[in-house]
Amino acid sequence: MFSFGFLITAVVFWVVTKVIYNAYFHPLRRFPGPFLNRATRLAYIYQVLGGKIHHSVLAMHQKYGDIVRLAPDELSFSHPDAWEHIMGHKKADQEEMGKAPWFYRTFKYEALSIVNEDRKPHARLRRPMSHGFSEQSLRDQGPVIRGYVDLFCQRLREASAKSQLVVLSDWLSYVAFDIVGDLSFGEPFGCLKEGKEDEWLTSMANLGTTGVIFQCLGFFPWIKEPLVMIFAKTMRKYRDAHLSSSTEKMRRRIEFNGERPDFIQGLLQKREQLNLRLEDLVSNAQLFIGAGAESTATLLMGVAYLLLKHDRVYEKLSDEIHSAFKNVDEITLTSVGQLPYLNACINETLRYYSPACNGLPRMVPKGGGYILGEYVPENTTVAVHHWALYHREKYFADPDSFRPERFLGDLEFANDQLKALQPFHVGPRNCLGRTLVYGETRLIFVLLIFHFHLRLAEESQNWMEQRHWLMWEKSPLMVHLTPREAVLC
């Protein structure tokens, strides 16, 4: 009994001492934030697991300013210049702020890819891979992308013939995954053809909550490691099922006799020089699917909802599209880039409903560094949280309203800090897929609005009331879909 009481006393003493140290003696003590966040990592974990940390971070920045202490060893920066300071290019003698291992390497057995490799291996992979994401490659990929978008329109026409009430979110997800699947593995997932998700994709619905739980457990390895051991067999079975399917797809892509304008071509050409194993190719292709297709599908759903939620915006965009194109043959990946209001709608969606939403954390290197003029000690986790920054009135007028005009020089938004919007990030690790995402999104919405009249269903009026973990928790987006007369898909 004495030993148990002594143990409890010791634990309580340690916890109280740790809390006092974190709040009042830690190297980050001068940075403001709520007491519980400054004192313990548990407050942050509670906010993350609740799926509403983007609201919490915004509230903190509104109260405390551009720099907030989210946890004892973590800072959030909410300022347009913070992007470059954290993620930007460094001088030759400067060490970059590397990606936080607890966020990017959740499991020890994970294969490394361009997203979680260290600086030098990342650059080694990125150079040959970047060719597949260039403007020229996008033009070469045009027929492939157009084929899937035309099939998307055809399947919507068939679906609307059965019922004008269509689950548009499903079809937007199908077209996004089929396009990226083809450009990653050389073949689609067959979602559009079958009218349903591939099993490989269905399991991604659990990725957000499962992934964020294990990320949070990473702060408590004495809990995480036993759990990983307990569930190792189940997790390995889940992983191997995906790996087997992906590996077979990659084998077929490698055996393809000829060049394709896809994401993998550059790596295949440099495979021997870079000493790339089959699993390295598979890991990067899976990344394109997991990150690229999911975020693109999220953007597509966001654009659709926000357009249909705002009749004025939808009608103005519809007028722009029908004024620009008289027949479907005029619609190409190149021509859809010349629509200023459409571009503004996409940018405003990226601001209002950022697919990334929260921060992608970096680590301050040895010797510390300066961010927004403030010295930050080494081993501090730092990040810019997209949603919170984009919804601050300090940088965007009327931030909680969907106003594409802010990207068209409207005087009402003359003081907006548009450089704060960095959905694809900055620096040597910025997202390669920017050109593809914009091109694909433009083409899909021009053809969708050219072929159909859309109206938001009553049951989806509050669709954007969502929680966010690694991805948004999206409910079905229901839309009334009516084919336009005399338009053939």
Curated annotation (Swiss-Prot):
Which parts of the chain span the membrane according to its record?
A: 1-21, 212-232, 287-307
- The positions annotated for binding heme are C431
Pathway given in the UniProt record: Secondary metabolite biosynthesis; terpenoid biosynthesis
* One Pfam match: p450
Cited function = Cytochrome P450 monooxygenase; part of the gene cluster that mediates the biosynthesis of paraherquonin, a meroterpenoid with a unique, highly congested hexacyclic molecular architecture. The first step of the pathway is the synthesis of 3,5-dimethylorsellinic acid (DMOA) by the polyketide synthase prhL.
* Membrane topology reported for the UniProt record: Multi-pass membrane protein
GO CC terms: membrane
Q: Which InterPro entries match?
A: Cyt_P450 (IPR001128), Cyt_P450_CS (IPR017972), Cyt_P450_E_grp-I (IPR002401), Cyt_P450_sf (IPR036396), Cytochrome_P450_monoxygenase (IPR050121)
Species the sequence originates in: Penicillium brasilianum
User: Where would you find this protein in the cell?
Assistant: Membrane
Q: Per its record, how is this protein called by name?
A: Cytochrome P450 monooxygenase prhB
Q: Which domain of life is it from?
A: Eukaryota
Its needed co-factors are: heme
Cross-referenced PROSITE patterns: CYTOCHROME_P450
Please provide the record's keywords in A-Z order.
Coiled coil, Glycoprotein, Heme, Iron, Membrane, Metal-binding, Monooxygenase, Oxidoreductase, Transmembrane, Transmembrane helix
Q: Which residues are glycosylated?
A: N347, N379
The processes (GO biological process) annotated in the record are: mycotoxin biosynthetic process; terpenoid biosynthetic process
Membership in a protein family: Belongs to the cytochrome P450 family.
The top EC class is oxidoreductase
According to the UniProt entry, its GO molecular function terms are: heme binding; iron ion binding; monooxygenase activity; oxidoreductase activity, acting on paired donors, with incorporation or reduction of molecular oxygen
The protein's Enzyme Commission number: 1.-.-.-
